[in-house]
Amino acid sequence: MTEVQQTEKVTPRLKTKYREEIRGRLQEQFQYGNVMQVPGLVKVVVNMGVGEAAKDSKIIDDAVTDLTAITGQKPMITKARKSIAQFKLREGMPIGTHATLRGDRMWEFLDRLVTLPLPRIRDFRGLSDRQFDGNGNYTFGLSEQTVFHEIDQDKIDRVRGMDITVVTTAKNDDEGRALLKALGFPFKTDQ
């Protein structure tokens, strides 16, 4: 008989911090009667628009490779919904790629994002706190994929930016801002 080795599942560091410290602090701060009212994270969507892929299909493959290395899962390819003659775009052509992260992958990605890539950005003074959508969700853009240490700078063919959306259960922007600040997001202090 062969023995099946049981590997112990490790809870992501940021998730543990949220459960043990942040949730209690937010419950006190906003005077929630129930712990389930405390805002939490739902998902993180990483989107990479690749408009040049309409002309050259190899470009989308490179974008998929980069996003796979960054997020740790294979992204979906976004296709054009309509044909637009001015952009030489036909319906069904690949124009971008996105990955939706949930669960432990989401927590690990956010932990890596806050600790490594954001401080590596040149002239970085913090994230703008004006990019909330009114419902506690936060979207920001990165201008290049090389800030992630998973990307080998010698092997990139072109610089690609990406949008990162953090979806929360917060009811308004103040709750969302408090949650993300507690998770370690570096917001600008003076406007």
UniProtKB/Swiss-Prot annotation:
<dbReference type="GO" id="GO:0019843">
    <property type="term" value="F:rRNA binding"/>
</dbReference>
<comment type="similarity">
    <text>Belongs to the universal ribosomal protein uL5 family.</text>
</comment>
<dbReference type="GO" id="GO:1990904">
    <property type="term" value="C:ribonucleoprotein complex"/>
</dbReference>
<comment type="subunit">
    <text>Part of the 50S ribosomal subunit; part of the 5S rRNA/L5/L18/L25 subcomplex. Contacts the 5S rRNA and the P site tRNA. Forms a bridge to the 30S subunit in the 70S ribosome.</text>
</comment>
<dbReference type="Pfam" id="PF00281">
    <property type="entry name" value="Ribosomal_L5"/>
</dbReference>
<protein>
    <recommendedName>
        <fullName>Large ribosomal subunit protein uL5</fullName>
    </recommendedName>
</protein>
<dbReference type="GO" id="GO:0003735">
    <property type="term" value="F:structural constituent of ribosome"/>
</dbReference>
<dbReference type="GO" id="GO:0000049">
    <property type="term" value="F:tRNA binding"/>
</dbReference>
<keyword id="KW-0687">Ribonucleoprotein</keyword>
<keyword id="KW-0820">tRNA-binding</keyword>
<dbReference type="InterPro" id="IPR002132">
    <property type="entry name" value="Ribosomal_uL5"/>
</dbReference>
<dbReference type="InterPro" id="IPR020929">
    <property type="entry name" value="Ribosomal_uL5_CS"/>
</dbReference>
<keyword id="KW-0689">Ribosomal protein</keyword>
<dbReference type="GO" id="GO:0006412">
    <property type="term" value="P:translation"/>
</dbReference>
<comment type="function">
    <text>This is one of the proteins that bind and probably mediate the attachment of the 5S RNA into the large ribosomal subunit, where it forms part of the central protuberance. In the 70S ribosome it contacts protein S13 of the 30S subunit (bridge B1b), connecting the 2 subunits; this bridge is implicated in subunit movement. Contacts the P site tRNA; the 5S rRNA and some of its associated proteins might help stabilize positioning of ribosome-bound tRNAs.</text>
</comment>
<dbReference type="InterPro" id="IPR031310">
    <property type="entry name" value="Ribosomal_uL5_N"/>
</dbReference>
<dbReference type="GO" id="GO:0005840">
    <property type="term" value="C:ribosome"/>
</dbReference>
<dbReference type="Pfam" id="PF00673">
    <property type="entry name" value="Ribosomal_L5_C"/>
</dbReference>
<dbReference type="InterPro" id="IPR020930">
    <property type="entry name" value="Ribosomal_uL5_bac-type"/>
</dbReference>
<keyword id="KW-0694">RNA-binding</keyword>
<keyword id="KW-0699">rRNA-binding</keyword>
<dbReference type="InterPro" id="IPR022803">
    <property type="entry name" value="Ribosomal_uL5_dom_sf"/>
</dbReference>
<dbReference type="InterPro" id="IPR031309">
    <property type="entry name" value="Ribosomal_uL5_C"/>
</dbReference>
